[in-house]
Design a protein with these regions (language model features):
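Structured alpha/beta reader/binder surfaces that contact nucleic acids or chromatin modification marks
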Residues: 1-103
Length: 103
């Protein structure tokens, strides 16, 4: 089974259904309908998620729906988190999205 790593701070938001998408700079080659093991390094915590939709968009086209799916309260919050993780992002950077649900 493929794995997808998440920061431990996202464990509860994912389990609670508050975070239903992840944006990544790298293409993780996950397919719609695929079951994946979500891992939270350093915690021993895992859960299974099903990939519902995949795609990509440029950083500049992140919208309010992405903010909600990512579990953030504002565009600024999400942009700051993405820039913390990927400091070399600019508005043209391609980000892959993976929408999912916990099984």
């Amino acid at each position: 089974m493929k794995t997808l790593k998440f920061n431990k701070k996202y464990y509860l938001p994912i389990l609670n259904g508050d975070k239903t998408q992840t944006l990544r700079k790298d293409n993780k080659r996950l397919n719609e309908g695929e079951t994946v093991k979500a891992v939270f390094p350093g915690t021993g915590l895992t859960c299974k998620i099903r990939i519902l939709k995949t795609g990509y968009k440029q950083f500049q086209y992140i919208d309010d729906e992405d903010v909600k799916r990512e579990g953030f309260h504002s565009m600024v919050e999400l942009e700051n988190e993405l820039l913390r993780i990927y400091p070399k992002c600019d508005r043209f950077t391609r980000l892959y999205y993976y929408r999912f649900k916990v099984l």
